[in-house]
């Protein structure tokens, strides 16, 4: 357990959680971010990094990756007072003597207040379901692609048939030594235009095939074994990198154990984003209230309200008047 007690712990490192962390830093309190994925950014970074977003205030258009990069750049100002914990899923929390002990699947964390900004729940990639898969994850087996350049000159195999799988195959065909795509059906689910580009490219297309085995050492996969659907043909595909693009699932399965009032996968909150537990708040898609509009922009407005309420709760005797950033940053 890290025995440092942080003022505010933000559960979720998507755009709303990142802005909440920045605003908390602006208010001069210590902050910890707990994110279930291996990187910050939430849905924009994982599900649509290259897609264009048109409803972010101040940006006529911005991609998901660009948006998250801006948030991370914004956080740099307070890097000394913000700790980031990746690849940790919150399981439970308990309050004793005005301090919360937050239990994750890896550690325990101490905090005076909690702000849930975890969207519809922790992200988890859909797996191949093959033996030793966990040994290769984040080494040379990937479930999403954030930097295409890392595959330059490599032999890459992609599993999947949706937009992401096909788009990655088309882009990697330009820079990789070779690309193969494996899909369990004859027809791809991706956009027709993207599929047409794929079929005209140098990408090796294997349909309908399913993965049945992984070969490699204790850390890196060296080949993928696939089998023809409704057939006996088996092919071994040597590779440098394997990309599994079966999508992601979200789950707030632990929500039911947190003694919070909730509806489906979101937490019911007051107009001040308070939950039914004192010192616990929820914002973004994690929060539910009448008239809720699930937009990133909405979450940006909710974050300062929740952070200010948390500060008032932690430091009731302090002068907590809100000051504009122009007065705080010189």
Swiss-Prot record:
EC number: 1.18.1.2
Keyword terms, alphabetized: FAD, Flavoprotein, NADP, Oxidoreductase
Catalytic activity: 2 reduced [2Fe-2S]-[ferredoxin] + NADP(+) + H(+) = 2 oxidized [2Fe-2S]-[ferredoxin] + NADPH
Recorded superkingdom: Bacteria
Cofactor(s), by name: FAD
Residues binding FAD, per UniProt: 35, 43, 48, 90, 123, 285, 326
GO MF terms, alphabetically ordered: ferredoxin-NADP+ reductase activity; flavin adenine dinucleotide binding; NADP binding
Cofactor binding remark: Binds 1 FAD per subunit.
Classification via Pfam families: Pyr_redox_2
Membrane-spanning intervals of the chain: none
Family: Belongs to the ferredoxin--NADP reductase type 2 family.
PANTHER family found in the cross-reference section: THIOREDOXIN REDUCTASE 1-RELATED-RELATED
Subunit note: Homodimer.
Protein name as it appears in the record: Ferredoxin--NADP reductase
